[in-house]
Amino acid sequence: MKIDANKEKALNAVLGQIEKQFGKGSIMKLGENRSMDVETISTGSLSLDIALGAGGLPMGRIVEIYGPESSGKTTLTLEVIAAAQREGKVCAFIDAEHALDPIYAKKLGVDIDNLLCSQPDTGEQALEICDALTRSGAVDVIVVDSVAALTPKAEIEGEIGDSHMGLAARMMSQAMRKLAGNLKQTNTMLIFINQIRMKIGVMFGNPETTTGGNALKFYASVRLDIRRTGAIKDRDEVIGNETRVKVVKNKIAAPFKQAEFQILYGQGINSTGELVDLGVAHKLVEKAGAWYSYKGDKIGQGRANAGKYLIENPAVAQEIDVALRALLLTPAAPVADSATGDENIDLETGEVF
């Protein structure tokens, strides 16, 4: 694009002035001096990484994971922490619910000796800790469990039954404004776990909403809706959950995709089972009757045995994983901003409907 000489001279002068005042890199052309690819961390589920479009959750962004009780929200975040730690990243867990089980976290592969953990007394304290960790530039992933447990100081110091209209929403709104810029500068991922509530008197549409006001919906680059869809049984014993995750909002790729996987009790996401299923679907793993084969070698009779073979042979599992990612992942392309995905907002009241 050719620019008029006088305009170009004026533009260069003002750019120089801005950089002198605010520092180099404070303003630049969009395609210049920056990485166009978003750095991501795996969620522990290959199908969810593919549904996200970029191979995982994005660094330097805010992520919200919400769903009903016991749907796998904390498990998913612990899988992300384990994946980040395997890459040598520093992680922190803000346990506002005071319910983190270190034994379970260790079973999922989390290095609990190097995981920073805080159990704050108030919501303001939790968010201040988040801000301090972010500004340090030394922490790569921060998880807050959960937004619903971030209780404002005024509510804690008041009496039960006192009205505190909009306190949590105002607190979250202020925190989002403060955190968003720092997260981008330090390339820190901030994951908020959230609970769902029912709106009273909704006749049509979805009565569900999340806690903490609307600010988080707008500032989050990715919003994941996680649900338990069924039970996994071994004879009569329930050993896990069938889980579905919907990408409700996605600023780094196309939204509204879904992923289905299994969460096994005491083990976490059944990643090897996913590799077997996706490998068969995309003809990387051959299936003849009950037998599964890879590159002509039999790897097991039945899905469970094939998965066990991949656990015992991580090099083969890694090979299939890399091949599937190369086949199914497309380069990340930013999409138009959307506040809440498939939800709508009443601009007068701020209600989600």
UniProtKB/Swiss-Prot annotation:
By its UniProt entry, which Gene3D superfamilies does this protein fall under? P-loop containing nucleotide triphosphate hydrolases (3.40.50.300)
Q: Where on the tree of life does the source sit, at the highest rank?
A: Bacteria
Q: Which GO terms describe its cellular component?
A: cytosol
Protein keywords: ATP-binding, Cytoplasm, DNA damage, DNA recombination, DNA repair, DNA-binding, Nucleotide-binding, SOS response
Please report a single Pfam family linked to this protein: RecA_C
Q: What is its main location?
A: cytoplasm
Q: Could you say which residues bind ATP here?
A: G67, P68, E69, S70, S71, G72, K73, T74
Q: Where in the cell is it found?
A: Cytoplasm
Which GO molecular function, any one, fits this protein according to its record? damaged DNA binding
- Secretion signal span: none
Which Gene Ontology BP annotations are present? DNA recombination; DNA repair; SOS response
InterPro entries per the UniProt record, alphabetical: AAA+_ATPase, DNA_recomb/repair_RecA, DNA_recomb/repair_RecA_CS, P-loop_NTPase, RecA-like_C, RecA-like_N, RecA_ATP-bd, RecA_C_sf
Family designation: Belongs to the RecA family.
Role description: Can catalyze the hydrolysis of ATP in the presence of single-stranded DNA, the ATP-dependent uptake of single-stranded DNA by duplex DNA, and the ATP-dependent hybridization of homologous single-stranded DNAs. It interacts with LexA causing its activation and leading to its autocatalytic cleavage.
- Name of the featured protein: Protein RecA
